Amino acid sequence: MIEIREVSKVFQDRKAVQGISLTIHKGNIFGLLGSNGAGKTTLLKTVAGIYLPDAGSVIIDGKPVFENPDTKGRIVFMPDFPYFFPQASIMQMADFYRSVYPRWSGERFKELGGLFSLDPKRKLNRLSKGMRQQAAFWLALSCMPDVLIMDEPLDGLDPVMRRLIKNVLFQEVAERGLTAVISSHNLREIEDLCDHVGIMHEGALLIDKELDELKSDTHKVQVAFRDERHEGALSGKLQILHRERRGSVCLYIVKGDRERIADAFRVYNPYVLDLLPLTLEEIFIYEMEGAGYDIAPILL
């Protein structure tokens, strides 16, 4: 289990992470979303023990991460641009990983090699971006980590390889209880992969919820009133994230219980009333608007 307790990180005069508390349970796949510059990568590096938090602590299975080799030996961090030694081949990097990670499995390395179909003797600097990303997964999973932290891990991969890697991650979670933390701007990928989601903005954590709960708690309402004066009265009754008019129909994005929302609209006897589900991408956009992020260009 990963426990993030009131963690803050400051670079010069900029607060990259501000007092974040978060618990990620063993065997979960946690998706970290956020606006550009929200502090996602800083938080991931702090969880991985690369950065020392200026305040708060990161605890994994009851032990601190920073400057704790035993705990770090069970964590693998995959940055958005994987780093390999100059002129190194996949096999040479495997030798290095074997010397660093005590749980390295040569058997697992061999198994995964059959999936990725990369030549282990080939130099990594001669591979395409997508092939280097495959190599990064190959090496990371061969370390048999308890915690895998990934920053934009599927970027550059073709659809077939994306599906393969998702299946391997699901297998690791199901069979070994792997805990995975994924930061990505591809919300459809997060929606497919994750069972829990956090949304960051300007260094703060806005949302920390199970994905199913988040989707069931936010609704798109299309409504046409017989009397337009009713529109204003709803603001005091419901938590409205967004409202716009499309001809005679009004569109609302509302947080809360579905039946309570429907009842609040039915009071005014609308002649059109539909409650529709939202995708994670839509929820993200409207939550960002609620946090003051300018989404006007998106909605045009």
Each language-model region and where it sits:
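ABC transporter nucleotide-binding domains
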Residues: 2-4, 9-201, 207
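A structural detector for beta-sheet-dominated domains
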Residues: 5, 25, 224-226, 255, ...
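Short phosphate-engaging motifs
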Residues: 16, 67, 189, 230, ...
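Short, flexible helix/strand-to-coil boundary loops that buttress conserved ligand/catalytic motifs
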Residues: 69, 215-218, 235, 265, ...
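Short loop/turn segments at beta->alpha junctions
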Residues: 89, 210, 276-279
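Short, surface-exposed beta-strand/loop "edge" segments at domain boundaries and coil↔beta transitions
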Residues: 148-150, 228-232, 259-262
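ABC transporter nucleotide-binding domain
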Residues: 165-256
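C-terminal coupling/interaction segments
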Residues: 253-300
